[in-house]
Regions:
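Acidic donor-binding/catalytic loop of UDP-sugar-dependent glycosyltransferases
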Residues: 35, 177, 234-251
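Acceptor/aglycone-binding surface of glycosyltransferases and processive sugar-polymer synthases
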Residues: 65-75, 204, 210-225, 242-323, ...
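Hydrophobic helical membrane-anchoring modules
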Residues: 6, 10, 56, 112-118, ...
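Conserved donor nucleotide-binding strand/loop of the catalytic core
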Residues: 179-225
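Acceptor-substrate binding/catalytic loop of class I
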Residues: 74-91
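A conserved acidic beta->alpha catalytic loop
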Residues: 171-180
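A short glycine-rich, Lys/Arg-flanked "PGG" loop and its adjoining helix->strand segment in the class I
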Residues: 40-55
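Short aromatic/hydrophobic "clamp" motif used to bind/position activated sugar donors
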Residues: 231
Length: 383
């Protein structure tokens, strides 16, 4: 009985494979993507090993079957498996695009357990061919409030990417020693600057204290002080791994997107990284904003984002206008990016539990605020 669903899966798989023929060779990935911790890196590695005319056929479980397959496992009708990636077709399409593939088709039966996606390598775009993906400077804004024990761990965890990096801490209204931790870190990094220069990589740390309140005000100040070609936001709570930041950089440098928005709702989360009610609310409002904006948003509340500084300067007036009703600043950026027709690309990231401190989100208050922002967006973009 434990193999019942596996038998159904393979029967469905055989029926669908009959409809596909490929020339130039193919690579078949049969139900493996559920176990891969970083699918973007996985597909990038595959791309490096195959010929340009090779097609990849990806077979995986339809995400609509997740609750049924989970129940089947509990009832002993399906073999036990570890925590799985449950991707819908848009999730996989987005990851393939980020990895340098072009999606040819995606098929599933109405009641089918199996989804088949066919993709091929994209022709390398001009920016990547000329090696310019490492020629842009980066300013990383890090708003920090009550993050004393996280601050010292941030910079060592940020990979070296880009022409040079400018890391901008903005602290405000902390009740612990966050500001002291930032200034101590800045001093230590300044002593190491000569070593970075010897290795032909420049990393500068700046620190400011905001006079206003809230994350949105902190990011606004950081953007005003930034000088890099690409602007990034990275939350000091470290719930998103800093090792994912190069993915945001590469998405812009390669021309795949113009506004890179993190998404924590693709991969499984760690423990109680996001409470169930918060997750459901995020999913609901993401669907609402997707319909309003006409561009796909899986996670509107992820704090990790990236955009070109030149684009930010063009949309700055709208950004400051929307900032008046958005204490976090995420929607002010999203509204402005959509209004200025920037191409949004989502970057799937892992979401971890906090190691220190507590969230600044007030569930019901900010839920009402999201409803207000959705109403403002509807009036702005639909009426």
């Amino acid at each position: 009985m434990a193999n019942l669903f596996q038998e159904l899966y393979h029967k469905d798989l055989k029926r669908i494979y009959k409809t596909f023929k490929t020339s130039g060779g193919s690579v078949i990935l049969d139900n493996v993507i559920g176990d891969i911790p970083d699918l973007q890196s996985y597909f990038e590695n595959i791309k490096r090993e195959i010929n340009p005319d090779t097609k990849i056929l990806i077979a995986y479980h339809n995400s609509a079957w997740e609750p049924f397959l989970t129940l089947a496992t509990k009832l002993g009708l399906r073999k036990k498996v570890g925590v799985q990636n449950w991707l819908d077709q848009e999730d996989l399409r987005n990851i393939l695009i980020l990895s340098g593939f072009e999606v040819i088709s995606s098929q599933r039966r109405f009641f089918g357990i199996t989804v088949i996606t066919v993709a091929k390598p994209q022709i390398a775009n001009y920016k990547l061919q000329t090696g310019s993906e490492s020629q842009y400077s980066v300013s990383i804004m890090i708003p920090a409030r009550n993050e004393e024990q996280n601050v010292s761990k941030i910079i060592p965890s940020i990979p070296r990417f880009g022409k040079w990096q400018e890391i901008i801490f903005v602290e405000g209204n902390s009740t612990d020693r966050t500001w002291s931790a930032i200034t101590n870190l800045k001093f230590l990094i300044s002593k190491q600057t000569s070593n970075f220069n010897e290795q032909k990589f420049k990393r500068v740390v700046k620190a400011y204290q905001q006079t206003g309140k809230g994350k949105a005000d902190a990011v606004r100040l950081g953007f005003a002080k930034a000088t890099g070609d690409i602007l990034m936001i990275y939350d000091a709570d470290r719930t998103v791994p800093a090792s994912d930041l190069p993915k945001f950089y590469n998405a812009l440098a390669s021309g795949i997107g113009e506004f890179a928005n993190g998404s924590r709702l693709v991969y499984p989360m760690e423990g109680q990284a996001m409470q169930t009610l918060n997750k459901l609310g995020n999913q609901f409002f993401s669907e609402v904003f997707t319909r309003i904006f006409g561009q796909h948003f899986k996670d509107t509340l992820c704090g990790t984002k990236a955009l070109w500084r030149s684009d930010f300067l063009k949309m700055k007036r709208d950004y400051l206008k929307y900032l008046r009703v958005d204490p976090f600043g995420d929607f002010a950026l999203i509204f402005s990016a959509v209004k200025h027709n920037l191409k949004v690309i989502e970057i799937p990231v892992r979401y971890k539990e906090r190691e220190y401190g507590s969230t600044n989100i007030k569930r019901f208050y900010h839920g009402l605020l999201l409803a207000k922002l959705a109403y403002i967006a509807f009036k702005e973009f639909k009426l």
